[in-house]
């Protein structure tokens, strides 16, 4: 089923397939580097989102604004995924830039969540800055809600609420 849809998409948007293939190669290189850091690991997803979102631009100003928005949204998505998978990746010995970065720091779960939240907040501030420069014509109220409230609420849910729920269910977790 998905294969048929991919073929249709390839015919209509071949540049998107190229961008996604490039992401996969660059993501693999970033994660296999000798000393990967969080920004280096988030870069391929951020660059991919930038390229995809810029395709919607009608002029150079829109390209700049949408590029900034897409880049930092891609970075946020990568970081949120890594944050969400943190404990699972420790157990499965899977790659996770937060596990690598924080492995030798003796942090509590709350301290770790606050550190990651700070990185995400920096990223959200860049998303919001770019978003505020956009001329939104459709669905503005929905998009305002997503950018101004939804990103932060998702961070809270993943970084703090999930931990509290797990702690109350199984006892404290602090790998």
Q: Can you name each region flagged by the protein language model?
A:
Residues 1-51, 55-68, 75, 79-109, ...:
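Acidic catalytic motifs of isoprenoid enzymes
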């Amino acid at each position: 089923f998905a294969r048929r849809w991919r073929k249709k998409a390839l015919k209509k948007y071949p540049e998107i397939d190229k961008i996604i293939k490039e992401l996969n190669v660059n993501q693999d290189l970033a994660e296999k580097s000798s000393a990967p850091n969080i920004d280096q690991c988030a870069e391929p997803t951020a660059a991919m989102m930038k390229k995809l979102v810029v395709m919607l631009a009608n002029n150079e100003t829109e390209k700049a604004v949408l590029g900034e928005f897409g880049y930092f949204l891609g970075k946020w998505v990568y970081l949120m995924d890594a944050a969400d998978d943190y404990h699972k990746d420790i157990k499965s010995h899977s790659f996770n830039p937060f596990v690598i970065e924080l492995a030798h720091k003796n942090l509590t779960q709350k301290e770790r969540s606050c550190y990651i939240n700070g990185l995400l907040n920096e990223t959200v501030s860049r998303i919001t800055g770019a978003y505020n420069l956009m001329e939104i014509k459709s669905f503005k109220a929905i998009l305002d809600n997503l950018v101004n409230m939804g990103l932060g609420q998702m961070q809270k849910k993943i970084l703090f609420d999930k931990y509290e729920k797990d702690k109350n269910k199984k006892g404290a977790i602090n790998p």
